[in-house]
């Protein structure tokens, strides 16, 4: 920084201290300017909080949001184009219903109904994904651009104005000790910054109809989502009512137990009056330590080398997103990387993926 720049910084700091500590009066801005500054400040706070709440409305599960952010970061590092989407609760419910509906089979009324409901829930999840995309494009992104560009630019102008005001007030207080030309230049710069800040704030407040249009786009997207959701649910309700009517009109099947097979008692002329008994085998020294000629085969798992980082699965883990590694309790997994404090990356049966740290017990830790 040049000597002139250092002097200017000293002037501003000295004036600020005299105002904060000594109670010196600085140049007052007019009421119209203060009113605009207050409105811009309220607008900035409103936009910032509305953005946060909108994201929470679309993606209410904070754990899923954090996990999605982590997976997207990993995908960018790996250069993957397709990123996993937010796991909609309707989609998770639909997959659960479809899975159990298939297990019950087509002969079960409940199983068929679960299949119908599950497919409808999955359609609702797709509609919800479309809502997320539309709201992001037409509401979240424009407001984020407003924060990053217009509001940030206004804050820059206001900060510059405050610095030039302090410089002008310091020189005005020492009028006669500094050249008049230097004081005049300080005043011109202060008035120039004030005009630029006023213009930028005025333009923002006068064009707030753009924010109204963006809010309207949010409501339109919600209306479209709810219309489609109502249509899907009405179709599902009709299907289920039709199944109830068909099941009620169908004659009930009577349960007929299978006839018992005759039980042969065999030879009843036993000395003790009971059932015939097989003679007990003789126990010898060699036979007491073996139950059969064939050795018992114990289940085995392919273990990674003892010097290779590895872990053992404590529970079953079902992958819900692309890039996750599923396993069963007792599986031995080769560790390749630790993503963060909650997630590992590893390999099992030739497949690589991510899995939660809490599901496994580390046998050989990763090198530090």
Swiss-Prot record:
<comment type="similarity">
    <text>Belongs to the endophilin family.</text>
</comment>
<keyword id="KW-0728">SH3 domain</keyword>
<feature type="region of interest" description="Required for dimerization upon membrane association">
    <location>
        <begin position="60"/>
        <end position="87"/>
    </location>
</feature>
<feature type="modified residue" description="Phosphoserine">
    <location>
        <position position="288"/>
    </location>
</feature>
<keyword id="KW-0965">Cell junction</keyword>
<keyword id="KW-0175">Coiled coil</keyword>
<feature type="modified residue" description="Phosphotyrosine">
    <location>
        <position position="315"/>
    </location>
</feature>
<keyword id="KW-0472">Membrane</keyword>
<dbReference type="GO" id="GO:0005829">
    <property type="term" value="C:cytosol"/>
</dbReference>
<dbReference type="InterPro" id="IPR050384">
    <property type="entry name" value="Endophilin_SH3RF"/>
</dbReference>
<keyword id="KW-0597">Phosphoprotein</keyword>
<feature type="region of interest" description="Interaction with ARC">
    <location>
        <begin position="218"/>
        <end position="254"/>
    </location>
</feature>
<dbReference type="InterPro" id="IPR036028">
    <property type="entry name" value="SH3-like_dom_sf"/>
</dbReference>
<feature type="modified residue" description="Phosphoserine">
    <location>
        <position position="292"/>
    </location>
</feature>
<dbReference type="GO" id="GO:0070161">
    <property type="term" value="C:anchoring junction"/>
</dbReference>
<dbReference type="InterPro" id="IPR001452">
    <property type="entry name" value="SH3_domain"/>
</dbReference>
<keyword id="KW-0963">Cytoplasm</keyword>
<feature type="coiled-coil region">
    <location>
        <begin position="180"/>
        <end position="250"/>
    </location>
</feature>
<dbReference type="GO" id="GO:0006897">
    <property type="term" value="P:endocytosis"/>
</dbReference>
<dbReference type="GO" id="GO:0031901">
    <property type="term" value="C:early endosome membrane"/>
</dbReference>
<dbReference type="Pfam" id="PF03114">
    <property type="entry name" value="BAR"/>
</dbReference>
<dbReference type="InterPro" id="IPR004148">
    <property type="entry name" value="BAR_dom"/>
</dbReference>
<keyword id="KW-0966">Cell projection</keyword>
<dbReference type="GO" id="GO:0042995">
    <property type="term" value="C:cell projection"/>
</dbReference>
<feature type="region of interest" description="Membrane-binding amphipathic helix">
    <location>
        <begin position="1"/>
        <end position="21"/>
    </location>
</feature>
<comment type="subunit">
    <text>Interacts with ARC, SYNJ1 and DNM1. Interacts with PDCD6IP. Interacts with BIN2.</text>
</comment>
<dbReference type="GO" id="GO:0042802">
    <property type="term" value="F:identical protein binding"/>
</dbReference>
<dbReference type="GO" id="GO:0008289">
    <property type="term" value="F:lipid binding"/>
</dbReference>
<keyword id="KW-0446">Lipid-binding</keyword>
<feature type="domain" description="SH3">
    <location>
        <begin position="306"/>
        <end position="365"/>
    </location>
</feature>
<feature type="compositionally biased region" description="Basic and acidic residues">
    <location>
        <begin position="245"/>
        <end position="263"/>
    </location>
</feature>
<feature type="region of interest" description="Disordered">
    <location>
        <begin position="244"/>
        <end position="307"/>
    </location>
</feature>
<dbReference type="InterPro" id="IPR027267">
    <property type="entry name" value="AH/BAR_dom_sf"/>
</dbReference>
<dbReference type="Pfam" id="PF00018">
    <property type="entry name" value="SH3_1"/>
</dbReference>
<keyword id="KW-0967">Endosome</keyword>
<feature type="domain" description="BAR">
    <location>
        <begin position="18"/>
        <end position="249"/>
    </location>
</feature>
<protein>
    <recommendedName>
        <fullName>Endophilin-A2</fullName>
    </recommendedName>
</protein>
<keyword id="KW-0254">Endocytosis</keyword>
<dbReference type="InterPro" id="IPR035824">
    <property type="entry name" value="Endophilin_A_SH3"/>
</dbReference>
<comment type="function">
    <text>Implicated in endocytosis. May recruit other proteins to membranes with high curvature.</text>
</comment>
<dbReference type="GO" id="GO:0002102">
    <property type="term" value="C:podosome"/>
</dbReference>
């Amino acid at each position: 920084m040049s000597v002139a720049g250092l002097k200017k910084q000293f002037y501003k700091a000295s004036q600020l201290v005299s105002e904060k500590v000594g109670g010196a009066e600085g140049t007052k801005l007019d009421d119209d300017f203060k009113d605009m500054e207050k409105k811009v400040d309220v607008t900035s706070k409103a936009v910032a909080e509305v953005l946060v709440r909108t994201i929470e409305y679309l993606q209410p599960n904070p754990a899923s949001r954090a996990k999605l952010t982590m997976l997207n970061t990993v995908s960018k590092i790996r250069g993957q184009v397709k990123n996993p989407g937010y796991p909609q609760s309707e989609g998770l419910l639909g997959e659960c219903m479809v899975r159990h509906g298939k297990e019950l089979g087509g002969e079960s009324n409940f199983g068929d109904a679960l299949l119908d409901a599950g497919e409808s829930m999955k359609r609702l999840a797709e509609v919800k994904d479309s809502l997320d995309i539309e709201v992001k494009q037409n509401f979240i992104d424009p407001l984020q651009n407003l924060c990053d560009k217009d509001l940030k630019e206004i804050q820059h102008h206001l900060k510059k104005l405050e610095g030039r005001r302090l410089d002008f007030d310091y020189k005005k207080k020492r009028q006669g000790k500094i050249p008049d030309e230097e004081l005049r230049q300080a005043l011109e710069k202060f008035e120039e910054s004030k005009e630029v800040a006023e213009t930028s704030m005025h333009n923002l407040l006068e064009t707030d109809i753009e924010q109204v249009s963006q809010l309207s786009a949010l409501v339109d997207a919600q209306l479209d989502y709810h219309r489609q959701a109502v249509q899907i649910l009405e179709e599902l309700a009709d299907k289920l009512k039709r199944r109830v009517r068909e099941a009620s009109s169908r004659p009930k099947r009577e349960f007929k137990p299978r006839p018992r097979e005759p039980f042969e008692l065999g030879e009843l002329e036993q000395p003790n009056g009971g059932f015939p008994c097989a003679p007990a085998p003789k126990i010898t020294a060699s036979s007491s330590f073996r139950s059969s000629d064939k050795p018992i085969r114990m289940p085995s798992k392919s273990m990674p080398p003892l010097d290779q980082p590895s872990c053992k699965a404590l529970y079953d883990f079902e992958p819900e997103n692309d890039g996750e590694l599923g396993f069963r309790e007792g599986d031995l997994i080769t560790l390749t990387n630790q993503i963060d404090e909650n997630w590992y990356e590893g390999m099992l049966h030739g497949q690589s993926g991510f899995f939660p740290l809490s599901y496994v017990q580390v046998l050989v830790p990763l090198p530090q």
